[in-house]
Every structure is written in structure tokens, then in C-alpha cells.
Amino acid sequence: MTKAIPKIGSRKKVRIGLRRNARFSLRKSARRITKGVIHVQASFNNTIITVTDPQGRVVFWSSAGTCGFKSSRKASPYAGQRTAVDAIRTVGLQRAEVMVKGAGSGRDAALRAIAKSGVRLSCIRDVTPMPHNGCRPPKKRRL
């Protein structure tokens, strides 16, 4: 039986430097659109804002984590506000519809930030999924 010949200089060593800031360096500059749809997803742990064009193609997205917040600070109203401002500034919207999903603490703060940013809102919809007596909810937390 012959031994496998070890490879000299694997590709993993080359990619180590590239992976460190891959998220920030590979992000494309967002297209600038005048009319679009702003989707606000406010969970209890994070706030995610996605800006799409009227056809539904994603133009830009931002979350509290990408804005620099970590752990429990991602769930704060201030994080939701900063996330909304970041998404709108980058895209440069003038007219938009807003779709809000979830019941997190960043929900109202994100809506306030969108309204103050100067974007003309045509409608605000609550698209939070509500069960019609579907699955059994998880048991209550005991601390």
C-alpha cells in the first residue's frame, strides 16, 4: 500500500485572511430606487429591515446585528430605529409601503424612524402571522 502524498500549501491558508471581513467587503452597493416596499420584521431578539422594489426583488437589507449591536442590545428600540435609518439612507427612497411583521420592541421605533425620515408612506400593513387555532404553543417559561 502506498502512502498518500501530502499537499504542500493548501488553499485553506490562502483564504483565512479573506474570510475575516467577508461580510463587509463583499456587500454590493445598493441600487437607488425611488419607490419600494419596506419590510420590518421585529422579533423578540432582533429587528430586520428589508427594502424591496415594487416587484418584490430585494434591494437592500439591514439588521440590528449588522448595525453593530450585539446580544440583548439587538432587541432594544434604539437598535430598531438605527436599523431603519441605515436601510432608508442607503437606498434613498421617496415613496414606500411598509409591511410590519412581529411583536418585538424594535417595531414601533422602526416605524417612527421611517416616518421621520421624509419617506412618503402610502400604506402601513400589519402582516404578523396569526394562527386560527393551529399548532399548540410552547409551554410557559419558568425561572
UniProtKB/Swiss-Prot annotation:
One of its GO terms (cellular component) is ribosome. GO terms for biological process: translation. Transmembrane segments: none annotated. GO terms for molecular function: rRNA binding; structural constituent of ribosome. Its main location: plastid. It holds the Pfam family Ribosomal_S11. The keyword Chloroplast applies. It comes from the Eukaryota. It is found in: Plastid, Chloroplast. PROSITE patterns: RIBOSOMAL_S11 (PS00054). Keywords: Chloroplast, Plastid, Ribonucleoprotein, Ribosomal protein, RNA-binding, rRNA-binding. Belongs to the universal ribosomal protein uS11 family. Part of the 30S ribosomal subunit. This is Small ribosomal subunit protein uS11c. It comes from Sorghum bicolor (Sorghum). The lineage of its organism: Eukaryota, Viridiplantae, Streptophyta, Embryophyta, Tracheophyta.
